[in-house]
Amino acid sequence: MADDTFITTAFANIGLSGDYGTSWFLTRLIGPSRALELMLTASRITAKECLDLGIVNTITPYEEVRNRARQLALDIANGPRTALRYMKENINRAVNSDLKTCLSGEARALMQCSRTDDHKEAVRAFMEKRPPIFNNPR
């Protein structure tokens, strides 16, 4: 999030109750009490407050936002695709599943990842004390 920006729900200012899952997402991000306060007051939340509440992961100076976003995208795109896919699945599963289900899913994913060329490359790179170079065709 750019350091000079803010967010607001603003629905209370226009006589609407909210849309696009605002209540669902905010409640899960910051808890029901804070979500309700933001919805009822329509107050502006600064970038720093968003960071403190856990709504965003980082604050970046405005001039650097585009470059930071591009670098983050490249870092992810250059990662081990199969492992990254399973990481996303694991996190998504964890939202609504019990621990046993999550552990089972993680174990299956780990076994799949352990058979990939990316894992083999990562082990070689670790032993050779160098960063891994994953096979990510474009």
Regions found by a protein language model. Give the residues of each.
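A short structural micro-motif
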Residues: 93-94, 129-133
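Glycine- (often His-adjacent) and acidic-residue-rich active-site loop
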Residues: 13-16, 94-98
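Short beta-strand->loop
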Residues: 98-102, 136
